[in-house]
């Protein structure tokens, strides 16, 4: 099974036996770029066009996080940083990626990157990209500060009753794309991915507390923070917090852009991410 942009479907096994599905495309000899999506999304969120553009430059590995997309949705494990770290490590191991990889995380994917680095270190990683991302989670964690659309959606977004969930998630409006003309199709596709994620998984991802500030202060690889100033899902202050903590981090704050900069302006996104990735050593 495959799609033209996303590549063949492959599978790795996490430390608890969970099957993690991912797709690979691009030159096998190119630098690996591992894409980790956000809460209640899947690897489909990146869109065929952006995946095709990225895969013309890199070996793109687009992962479905546990509980999302085609990956297994176990009953437990969502509150354990080591389990999340193990999922990423399993994909890297399955692809024999031992050095030079770039991890790019959108939204909750940024937290998963930090989980991985906290457990496995940076030996296999050349750099990280945090896109509208959280790096910590829990009450009082500056790296996990959510925006007004996310606050409005909780707790209804976790409900099993469809009418409640749809109404709550509808409060996102255009948050994932921004009020960009002509993005209605993309907005509905992302909304569909959210609804297709099991309610118990939507809830479980918030049911943990972890702080990664110390990890970021001591990060020994380059990092690039990309965040919309009008992000209503993950407040821009969370991105600024990460950029301030990480030694030498680069940052790009997109004025007036909401939670999905790669949807709002894929060409600009491709350019900025490529500039960072192409400037890395190793």
Could you say what each language-model-derived stretch is?
Residues 140-145, 159-218:
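Conserved alpha/beta-hydrolase catalytic His-Asp/Glu region
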Residues 257-270:
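Catalytic histidine-centered segment of alpha/beta-hydrolase-like enzymes
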Residues 219, 225-227, 231:
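Short beta-strand/loop motif that positions the catalytic acidic residue
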Residues 232-238:
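Conserved alpha/beta-hydrolase "acid-adjacent" motif
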Residues 15, 23, 62-104, 108, ...:
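Active-site loop/oxyanion-hole signature of alpha/beta-hydrolase fold enzymes
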Residues 37-39, 105-110, 228:
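Conserved alpha/beta-hydrolase "nucleophile elbow" surrounding the catalytic nucleophile
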Residues 18-74:
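Conserved HGGG/HGGXW glycine-rich cap/lid loop of the alpha/beta-hydrolase fold
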Residues 114-159:
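Flexible "cap/lid" loop of the alpha/beta hydrolase fold
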